[in-house]
């Protein structure tokens, strides 16, 4: 109910990591939810499904199946190495597609999930000191966070049953200005340096599959080491 909702005013320039850390400081629950303001619910029981996984002892971060406004897949887990950093699994696939080895329709583990819709225990959040607001203000903070949580000995889960629309970048716009592009490149470089080994060999993704496209296709001979 609205009586249980508290609206906080963040008194500083946009910094996705800092804003979410600020919100968590005021939260009282044992499970934290990061939900972007451009998210729209499709599955009525989405939260029940995601909390069911988040409260398991073996689970760290839990992400959802996110769709573009035209119902194409926007997010069905995160694969390390796409674009040199990380990208969304099965991006632009039809909503009805099962995906590679049913990984769109089946709940399964990924190294990371997007924080556009992410649940995690408060204890895990505190254990890794939240999101990195100094080095990752906008991009890749969720990937960095998921990998830190994974380091606690738990698995990050993509919850296929929870479907939501993600009207991506409607509120902020795209990072197309020179300043935003420079910031993105700095954050990409930080991720590549901090998680070099994981990006080179994502344990949730086959080394025989390409990192050139987000579609789980087999590597071309020119991509083989």
Regions found by a protein language model. Give the residues of each.
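Acidic donor-binding segment of Leloir-type glycosyltransferases
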Residues: 1-13
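Catalytic metal- and UDP-sugar-binding loop of GT-A-like glycosyltransferases, i.e.
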Residues: 10, 35-37
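Glycine-rich, basic loop-to-helix element that forms the pyrophosphate-binding segment
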Residues: 10-27
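Short aromatic/hydrophobic "clamp" motif used to bind/position activated sugar donors
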Residues: 32
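Short glycine/serine/threonine-enriched helix-capping/active-site loop
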Residues: 62-65, 159-160, 167
């Amino acid at each position: 109910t609205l009586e249980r909702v508290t609206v906080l005013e963040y008194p500083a320039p946009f910094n996705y990591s800092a804003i979410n850390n600020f919100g968590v400081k005021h939260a009282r629950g044992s499970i934290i939810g990061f939900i972007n303001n451009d998210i729209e619910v499709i599955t009525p029981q989405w939260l029940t499904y995601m909390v069911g996984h988040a409260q398991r002892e073996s689970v760290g971060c839990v992400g959802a199946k996110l769709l573009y406004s035209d119902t194409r897949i926007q997010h069905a887990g995160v694969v390390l190495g796409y674009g040199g950093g990380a990208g969304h699994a099965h991006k632009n696939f039809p909503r009805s597609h099962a995906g590679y080895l049913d990984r769109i329709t089946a709940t399964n583990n990924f190294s990371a999930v997007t924080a556009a819709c992410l649940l995690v225990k408060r204890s895990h959040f505190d254990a890794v000191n939240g999101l990195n607001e100094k080095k990752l203000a906008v991009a890749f903070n969720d990937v960095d966070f998921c990998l830190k949580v994974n380091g606690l000995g738990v698995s990050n889960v993509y919850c296929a049953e929870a479907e939501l629309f993600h009207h991506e970048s409607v509120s902020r716009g795209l990072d197309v200005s020179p300043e935003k592009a420079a910031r993105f490149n700095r954050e990409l470089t930080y991720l590549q340096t901090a998680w070099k080994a994981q990006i080179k060999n994502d344990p949730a993704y086959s080394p025989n599959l390409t990192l050139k496209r987000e579609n789980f296709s087999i590597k071309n001979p020119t991509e083989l080491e």
